[in-house]
Amino acid sequence: MSELNALLKDINGSLTATSESLERLSGIYSNSATDEIPESNQLHEHLFYDAKKPAEKVSLLSLKNGSMLGYINSLLMLIGNRLDDECKDPSAMDARERSIQHRVVLERGVKPLEKKLAYQLDKLTRAYVKMEKEYKDAEKRALEKSTLVNHSGNDDSEDDESSEDEIAYRPNTSGIINTNKKSSAYRVEETAKQENGEENDDNETGVYKPPKITAVLPPQQTHFEDRFDAREHKDRSNKSRMQAMEEYIRESSDQPDWSASIGADIVNHGRGGIKSLRDTEKERRVTSFEEDNFTRLNITNKAEKRKQKQRERNARMNVIGGEDFGIFSSKRKLEDSTSRRGAKKTRSAWDRAQRRL
């Protein structure tokens, strides 16, 4: 209640001050008919001529001030309507709608514009303050310089008169400086012509020729030696090994192994099984190709969809109780993957037919 009373007192004080200023203006305007007062004439011209001119543009500051004053006026009318139940003024009845309208203008119109223009306004104000400061500093330096010149002028006047006769017979130093400058510039031009003879020829013909750049190999990393050899992970027939052999080689090798995060290799929320290492490598190659070439590979054709569905069906068959038993589903024999004979071509037709089974 104390805050509300203080707020009402402030509102009453502002209203009394506004009423006093309006009474003063009305007194000045009423006396303008009898007495010729320049202030009253200016007020009369502003009210009847300047204020009635159509405004071509509305500034942000005027819109903000007008909306704020209209919002405060609507709130006061709404408060008065609440306090006085017998009030029949139609403007007081529409105070709620006008207060909502002004509030929307302030929040949706003025505030976003202020945020957009805040950087430019701050930049302009900083530039103005900086310019004003530099102007004041320049004035201060000029004043100090003028005072120093005035003090030193009286002391040096006698020395200047005595040295005028000596300076009258001095050599022409400006000519020496100009010749030195010309000679140095000439030497620089000659050296440039000798070094860049081809460029001078190009300038004379008017045709641009790019400079010749010697081919240089890219920098090679000598501090780290990558011992990974992709040929060790393939058979001589260029076909993939059995899954059991792949896992055995991967676990027994000393090479650093790359693995996805936990759960990243689960396909189709667990219904598609677990993504194999071959599929992961393929996706990684596709991703690196897309990132290097800035393009998308369209691999969602019918054949790929058919293969994907087949892989999902096989994965559902191989996963039992959450464990992948796909290492036992390969039709190839272990002897064919480990022995040298398996990499060679079979000798008889019966062996080749048996190999296809």
From Swiss-Prot:
Provide ranges: composition bias, Basic and acidic residues.
Answer: 187-196, 348-357
Chain positions with N-acetylserine modification: S2
Q: For this UniProt record, give its keywords in alphabetical order, as a comma-separated list.
A: Acetylation, Nucleus, Ribonucleoprotein, Ribosome biogenesis, rRNA processing
InterPro entries annotated for this entry?
Answer: Sas10/Utp3/C1D
Q: Identify one Pfam family in the record.
A: Sas10_Utp3
The protein's location, in the record's own words, is:
Nucleus, Nucleolus
Q: Name the job this protein performs.
A: Component of the U3 small nucleolar ribonucleoprotein. Required for the early cleavages at sites A0, A1 and A2 of the pre-ribosomal RNA. Participates in ribosome biogenesis.
Specify the protein name: U3 small nucleolar ribonucleoprotein protein LCP5
What organism is this sequence from? Saccharomyces cerevisiae (strain ATCC 204508 / S288c) (Baker's yeast)
